[in-house]
Amino acid sequence: MSADRNANRNDEALKDASTPVGTAPVGIDELLERVRAGYDRIGPAEAATAAEAGALLVDIRYAALRDRDGLIPGALVVERNELEWRLDPRGSHRATEAVGHDLRIVVICNEGYASSLAVASLRQLGLHRATDLIGGFQAWRAAGLPVASV
């Protein structure tokens, strides 16, 4: 068997193993569209208003971006790879801010893409009021909302 045919067969096997039975793989744009169809996203002004009303703003940007661009005052900083563990109210590693499943959470990434995927995961944990910021931190800053230096 030629190397190309063997490589194609391996690619197909990997695709089959990682795709739930009965579903075809999708691209990231379609995945985002599907995820976002399940909830209402909010803009910067609405996120600021939500925070004033008690919502938890959660900044999932990585450290280099926070160092470069600053922080949203009052936002909880949680690395993306720890998010579910820190916000699951039933989890043993939860943040003190993770007070219950009814908590309004606004997830913020840099531009509003990774946050949508994070919200899908939080909603699977029962955090049904989780949403994300359209345009992410960059939209927050462009709207002239408060940003603190690191």
Would you name each region that the model predicts?
Residues 1-56, 63-104, 113-150:
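Rhodanese-like catalytic fold shared by cysteine-dependent sulfurtransferases
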